[in-house]
Amino acid sequence: MSDTEQERWSRVKGRLRSTVGEDIYSSWFARMDLESVHGESVRLSVPTRFLKSWIQAHYAERVLSCWQAELPDVHRIDLTVRSAMRCAAPVREAPATDARHPERSEGRNGVELKTVATAPASANHDALGGSPLDPRLTFQSFVTGRSNTLAHAAARQVAEGRRGDSVMFNPLYIHAGVGLGKTHLLQAVTWAGNAGTERRVLYLTAEKFMYGFVAALKTQTALAFKEALRGIDVLVIDDLQFLQGKSTQAEFCHTLNALIDAGRQVVIAADRPPSDLESLDDRVRSRLAGGLVVEMGSLGEELRLGILRSRVEAARVHHASFDVPEPVLDYLAKAITHNGRDLEGAINRLLAHSKLNAQPVTLEMAEREVRDLVRPQEPRRIKIEDIQRVVARQYNVSRSDLLSSRRTANVVRPRQVAMYLAKTLTLRSLPEIGRRFGGRDHTTVLHAVRKIEALVSKDTTLSDEVELLKRQLQE
C-alpha cells in the first residue's frame, strides 16, 4: 500500500471518528483496515463476520460518505473478513528467559521482559464451540508495567486457582482501549487454566456466545447449550461490548448468575467499564460492577520499551541474526504511543525490511518505515463523551444518569461537574453542551458552570476532585 493511500486512510478514519463519536468508533471501526483502492471501489477488512454485518447494516452510508469526501470518484465500499488465524498444535509453556541469558532479564526502569513462549496444549472445549486461541498469548509473553500490573496479578491468580477453591474476584472484569492487552490476558488465563486436566476453562468472544445461543434456539438445543455452559469451571468472555439482543443478554445474565452462584469463575473484558455499557441490561451491569473491575491504562514509555524488546526477542527465535539497536528501540518507544499493536507492527516492518534487503536496522531506516505510525505530539483533544465517562466513573453513576432528568443529589452534582468541565476543557458552545447532556437548555449549563465555579473557590474537597478529573482527561 502506498504512502498516499495510508495518508488518505488516516484522514478517512479521522473523519469517521468525528462523525460517529469516539465510543462508537472504538467499538466498531478501530479494527478496520484498508486493503486497497481501485478506481471507484475501496476494499476494507475487519476481523470478524459479526463486525462486517453490523457495519454494513448500520454504518455503510457513513463509511462511503467519509471516503467520498476524500475521493469523490469512490462509489462502492467492499467490506471483507480477514482470515482467522488457525493455530497449530501448541506445546507446553517453557519458563520465560532472555534469549541471550539463562536468567529472566529486567529491562531499564524495572520493566519485566519476557520472551514469547509457546502455549500449553488445549482443546478449548471445541464441543462447546470455543473461540480460537493464539498460542503466542500466554502469561509468559505478557510484558508488565505500571498500567497493567493489577490486571495481570488478578488474572494470574484466577488462572492458578483450583477446582473447589474459594473465588476471590468474581466476576473479574478488565476494561481498556484497543491494543492494550485485554485479549492477551484473557487468552493467557485460558491457556494456563487448561494446562492441567483439573478445570474446564472456556474462552468465547461475545460474538461467539451470541451466535452459539441463536444457533441453539434455531436447532432446538438451547437446553443443552445452557447446561454445557453452566458446567464450565471458568468462563472467559471477550469483547462484551458487542453483546446484542435482549434474549441473548437475558441468557448471558442467567449464565453469569448461575456460574457465580455455583462458585465458578467468570472473567470478562470490554473496551469500557460496566457503567458505560449502556446497551446492556441494568441487571447485567450491576452484576459485573459487583466483582473486581480493573482498568488497563495507556502504555507508558517504560512499558512500550519493554514490549518492543520482548518482540525483538521473539523474532530472534526464527531470525537469530535480527537485531534492533538500543537507540532505535528508544526512538520507537518515544514515537509510537498509541497501542501495543502498533509497536508489534513496527518490529515486523523492521524485520521484513532488514531480511528482504539484507540490511541492518538503523535509526534512519526506522524513521522511514514507521512514519505512518507516529502521531504528532499535540495536546489531547478532549471530547464531551470522554468527560461524561470519566465523571461517571469517578462518582459511581452511569453516563445515562448524567443525561437523564433525574434530580437526586448523587446525580445532580456529577452532572454539574461534567458540564463545568465541558465548558472549560472543550470549545463547545453552551447550547451544544446542553444538547449533549440530554437536550438541556443553555441556561441550565450556564447555571451549572457558575455553581461549580463558586463551589470550587471555597470547597477544597470539590476543588481537588475537579483537578483530579482534569488530570485524568488530559493524560
Curated annotation (Swiss-Prot):
Signal peptide: none annotated. Keywords: ATP-binding, Cytoplasm, DNA replication, DNA-binding, Lipid-binding, Nucleotide-binding. Residues 132-354 are annotated as: Domain III, AAA+ region. GO terms for biological process: DNA replication initiation; regulation of DNA replication. Coiled coil: none annotated. Residues 73-131 are annotated as: Domain II. Its main location: cytoplasm. InterPro entries: AAA+_ATPase (IPR003593), Chromosome_initiator_DnaA (IPR001957), Chromosome_initiator_DnaA-like (IPR020591), Chromosome_initiator_DnaA_CS (IPR018312), DnaA_C (IPR013159), DnaA_dom (IPR013317), DnaA_N_dom (IPR024633), DnaA_N_sf (IPR038454). The keyword Cell inner membrane does not apply. SMART domains: AAA, Bac_DnaA_C. GO terms for cellular component: cytoplasm; plasma membrane. Residues 355-475 are annotated as: Domain IV, binds dsDNA. Residues 1-73 are annotated as: Domain I, interacts with DnaA modulators. ATP binds at residues 179, 181-183. Oligomerizes as a right-handed, spiral filament on DNA at oriC. Domain I is involved in oligomerization and binding regulators, domain II is flexibile and of varying length in different bacteria, domain III forms the AAA+ region, while domain IV binds dsDNA. HAMAP family: DnaA_bact (MF_00377). This is Chromosomal replication initiator protein DnaA. It comes from Nitrobacter winogradskyi (strain ATCC 25391 / DSM 10237 / CIP 104748 / NCIMB 11846 / Nb-255).
